[in-house]
Curated annotation (Swiss-Prot):
Gene that produces this protein: SYM1
Family stated for the protein in its record: Belongs to the peroxisomal membrane protein PXMP2/4 family.
Subcellular location: Mitochondrion inner membrane
Segments passing through the bilayer: 15-31, 48-66, 82-99, 143-159
GO annotation (BP), single: ethanol metabolic process
Organism: Yarrowia lipolytica (strain CLIB 122 / E 150) (Yeast)
The protein, known as: Protein SYM1
Biological function: May be involved in cellular response to stress. Required to maintain mitochondrial DNA (mtDNA) integrity and stability.
Keyword Mitochondrion: yes
Keyword Transmembrane: yes
Length: 202
């Protein structure tokens, strides 16, 4: 565990890219395996990994920026959900559309159909987790903690991106499963943080 802590401290952006891309690809694999009747598409998983490589540095920089602000935790979470969450969802659907070779008009239509439902779903999950993340998790491990929760969220994003849903429709079953998984992830991350703190003190 000590070696991982040292790598996080020495190469925060590289480690963020590695963990984020890995978990985005795993999330896509899970989405294809359990929420799709189509044959597995390796290129779809590869696109998820490529997107994550571009997204991870921005997420790391954002967490560092928020972590440096002398604000209450609740204020940091509010800013995160008012600024980063809406922009990151739009960025996801736009970049994935470009990687899939869609036209700008098609990407715009996908955003109109899926953006608001996805954002509302995110607001049911991420604020509570980010309160835990900014309030308890040490700064060096916040990206990793978000990625652990993000494994479930990425599965949902992959599902949303692959299914061109009508406006106003939300995958209720998927959302409930995501919320349950997030609860489990929070417990697991809290346990890991306690272990990591013990190693750091040594």
């Amino acid at each position: 565990m000590n070696w991982y802590v040292r790598l996080l401290q020495k190469y925060p952006y590289r480690m963020a890219v590695t963990s984020t891309s890995s978990l985005f690809m795993i999330g896509d694999c899970v989405s294809q395996r359990y929420f799709s009747d189509k044959p597995y598409e390796p290129m779809r998983t590869a696109r998820a990994g490529i997107y994550a490589c571009a997204f991870a540095p921005a997420m790391t920089a954002w967490f560092r920026f928020l972590g440096q602000q002398q604000l209450p935790v609740i204020a940091k979470v509010a800013i995160d959900q008012a600024v980063f969450a809406p922009s990151s969802i739009g960025y996801y659907f736009s970049v994935m559309g470009l990687l899939e070779g869609k036209s700008p008009d098609t990407i715009w239509q996908s955003l109109k159909n899926q953006y608001w439902d996805t954002l509302k779903c995110g607001w049911m999950i991420w604020p509570a987790f980010q309160l835990f993340n900014f309030g308890i998790v040490p700064p060096n491990f916040r990206v990793l903690a978000s990625n652990c929760c993000g494994l479930v969220w990425n599965t949902f994003l992959a599902y949303q991106n692959a299914n061109k849903m009508e406006k106003g429709h939300v995958a209720d079953l998927v959302i409930e499963e995501v919320k349950e998984e997030v609860k489990e992830v929070k417990q697991e991350v809290l346990a890991e943080v306690k272990v990591i703190k013990g190693f750091v003190k040594q």
